[in-house]
From Swiss-Prot:
Active site feature: 127
Cofactor: Mg(2+)
Role this protein plays: Catalyzes the phosphorylation of D-fructose 6-phosphate to fructose 1,6-bisphosphate by ATP, the first committing step of glycolysis.
Binding-site list for substrate: 125-127, 162, 169-171, 222, 243, 249-252
Compartment(s) where it occurs, according to its Swiss-Prot or TrEMBL record: Cytoplasm
Residues bound to ADP: 21-25, 154, 185-187, 211, 213-215
Annotated organism of origin: Clostridium novyi (strain NT)
Enzyme class: transferase
One Gene Ontology biological process: canonical glycolysis
Protein name per the record: ATP-dependent 6-phosphofructokinase
GO cellular component, one term: 6-phosphofructokinase complex
Known pathway: Carbohydrate degradation; glycolysis; D-glyceraldehyde 3-phosphate and glycerone phosphate from D-glucose: step 3/4
Catalytic activity: beta-D-fructose 6-phosphate + ATP = beta-D-fructose 1,6-bisphosphate + ADP + H(+)
Length: 319
């Protein structure tokens, strides 16, 4: 193992830069040549590859986004596209690749490994939807971003005595809604993992109004869908002014939290160590505050780890 490369793929997440920094500096410390691949798999098959040095990753640990950029790549989904990427890696003398991203990015790494490329995956996604790891890079920061928005919405909701429905990211995983809901003291958390009844929700809102509540904050994971319809239903049923706020890509930005910076640093170091050990088709993660690594096929096939106990806590504390 003489030369490794690092790329970021899929949706960006705060802390990706910290992971890049850890990979680059660990690789250099171990005597490796480290290359950066720009714009994910798209950059790979287009040869957008450059050598990285210690100064290449100076002053980036605090920055959101990814200095390597990221992109989707339809061509890489084809066998011809992947073979083109492998040939480019060979042309640059690259022996192993560290892929930072979510499940789609890991599937790409999995396909590369089947073509003989040593690959290690680092989980970078605000959705926290990879079951093999307790936390993904970017999730903690995104939770705090949502929390900040909730705090502000609480102020104006109280002033106008209205219901605020806040739609957050999370197509198949409700962790972001759940954690932000508990942290923000939301009256209701609606996630794809749990069924909910609109009529019961409206009844609870009216009961709160009778007790003198000035506002209601409802956190809705985007995977549930129907935010506008729910907003209309609540207002028509309760007679209380109801507003929908969709936070969107705001949740992906911002300076990463201390937790995400440290997590990214730990996982970046581990990824390089695994390559030096000759390992491939592995992903790194965190379980019980211990850095772990798993086979990429097993990691992708693990079922969702939704925390039912935490969801029950959210319901107990909500009203």
């Amino acid at each position: 193992m003489k030369t490794i490369a690092v790329l970021t793929s899929g949706g960006d997440a705060p802390g990706m830069n910290a992971a890049i920094r850890a990979v680059v500096r660990t690789g250099l410390d171990k005597g490796l040549k480290v290359m950066g691949i720009q714009r994910g798999y798209s950059g790979l098959i287009n040869g957008e590859i450059f050598e990285m040095h210690r100064y290449s990753v100076a002053d980036i640990i605090h920055r959101g986004g990814t200095i390597l950029r990221t992109a989707r790549c339809e061509e890489f989904k084809t066998e011809a596209g992947r073979k083109k990427g492998v040939n480019i890696l060979k042309a640059f003398g690259i022996d192993g690749v560290v892929v930072i991203g979510g499940d789609g990015s890991f599937q790409g790494a999995q396909l590369l490994s089947k073509l003989g490329v040593k690959t290690i995956g680092i989980p970078g996604t605000i959705d926290n939807d990879l079951a093999y790891t307790d936390y993904t890079i970017g999730f903690d920061t995104a939770t705090n971003t949502v929390l900040d928005a909730i705090n502000k919405l609480r102020d104006t909701s109280s002033s106008h005595e209205r219901v605020s429905i806040v739609e957050v990211m999370g197509r198949g995983c409700g962790d972001l809604a759940l954690f932000a809901g508990i942290g923000g003291g939301a009256e209701s958390v609606i996630v794809p993992e749990k069924e909910f009844n609109e009529d019961e929700l409206c009844k609870t809102i009216l009961e709160g109004k009778l007790r003198g509540k000035l506002h209601n904050l409802i956190i809705l994971a985007e995977g549930v869908g129907g935010g506008e319809a729910l907003t209309k239903k609540v207002q028509e049923t309760t007679g209380i002014q109801t507003r929908l706020t969709t936070l969107g890509h705001l949740q992906r930005g911002g300076s990463p939290s201390a937790f995400d910076r440290i997590l990214a640093s730990r996982l970046g170091v581990k990824a390089v160590e695994l390559l030096l050990e000759g390992k491939s088709s592995r992903v790194v993660g965190l379980r019980n505050n211990k850095v772990v690594d798993d086979d990429i096929d097993e990691a992708l096939s693990m079922k969702s780890k939704f925390d039912d106990e935490l969801y029950d806590i959210a319901k107990i504390l909500s009203y």
